[in-house]
Amino acid sequence: MSVQAALIDERGELAACVDGVPQLDVGASTDVLDGLPKTEGVPWLIRSMAPNVIAMDELSGAEDAACVMDAWACGASVLATVHGTALAETANRPALSSLFSRRCFDLYVLLSSEGGGKITALHDRCGSPIPLS
């Protein structure tokens, strides 16, 4: 199965595009929207590119959550990051709680803030822990 992936790189931190060309490896066939807000990027991608997966960073407020909901409702999977101290704390934020209650994400990966992003825990779409092997 072929995966059509897209990346919304709002601040240029993920793909580090120079003259429209990603300098970091984001996948050979990944469409990158550089410098475009999620609120503009998600609808544009859904209408024009029909990706299976949309990657974006740092969800924070209600507008970001609405973008994820729009992508999810149109059948696209979303890969996103959120800064937080624990899954429960993040899931209970008013702006993001609807994403968790509707189970918009299949997997939650918790990373340590120390040691270069070491995986500290995995949780399924219901928030149940998945053992690390």
Listing of model-derived features with the role each one plays in the protein:
Residues 7, 31-34, 80, 110, ...:
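Structural signal for conserved beta-strand scaffold positions within catalytic alpha/beta enzyme cores
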Residues 1-45:
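P-loop NTPase switch/communication element
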Residues 107-133:
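Conserved P-loop NTPase
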Residues 24-27, 98-100, 127-131:
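Short, low-complexity, polar/charged sequence segments that are solvent-exposed and flexible
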Residues 39-40, 66, 97, 129:
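A broad, structure-centric signal for solvent-exposed, well-ordered loop/edge residues
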